[in-house]
Amino acid sequence: MARLTKRLKSIKDKVQPGKVYAIDDAFEVLKSVSSVKFVESVDVAVNLGVDPRKSDQAVRGATVLPHGTGKSVRVAVFAQGANAEAALAAGADIVGMDDLGAQVKAGELNFDVVIAAPDAMRVVGQLGQILGPRGLMPNPKTGTVTPDVATAVKNAKAGQVRYRTDKKGIIHCTIGKISFDSAALKENLEALLADLKKLKPSTAKGVYVKKITVSSTMGPGLAVDQSTLAA
């Protein structure tokens, strides 16, 4: 039988299989078993009571986390004229139109988020095969195709997260770093859940938020007692 590493043994000793954790306890367990040499992200998986086979039950949106994600985000904006100036003033890292499109086609994807003014979609529309598979294609539903590019840039820089249900009806999202205090992680999670509930499809039946699981990059997944959350 293979011997457990020290890290895995620590996880095995501190995590009770099948237990549903109060949210504060869940974060404290993740912190206690974190022993890697980098600052892990804290992620959440939310199982929703939707039928992922039905397009009208797909859940897609964006949430500005009150305490951000702990990540530095590079933002590219497709815009011109006054919109381009507003994007730069708001802190965008790269702004352009056809020139930025040429960079993307050349494989220069030096950004984490792409925002587009509506009149820039003639350029962005040609980049779907490049941006789409990377989750970077701007979309009105996530606020990344908008006439107010300045606000979109500020939101992205402030720690906005974008999400959509996968083939199993699950939302996956980062809610911060393991170095955040538990209260900040909890508030980020509650902000996400509040927005998810606003996005509930009218055709979804039964329990909407079925299960919440939090985990760290290299840590275990812990089921969360929803009654310990405000959202």
Swiss-Prot record:
Pfam families named among the record's database cross-references: Ribosomal_L1 (PF00687)
Keywords noted in UniProt: Repressor, Ribonucleoprotein, Ribosomal protein, RNA-binding, rRNA-binding, Translation regulation, tRNA-binding
Keyword field contains Glycosyltransferase: no
CDD domains, per the entry: Ribosomal_L1
Keyword tRNA-binding: yes
NCBIfam families according to UniProt: rplA_bact
Subunit relationships: Part of the 50S ribosomal subunit.
Protein name: Large ribosomal subunit protein uL1
Gene encoding the protein: rplA
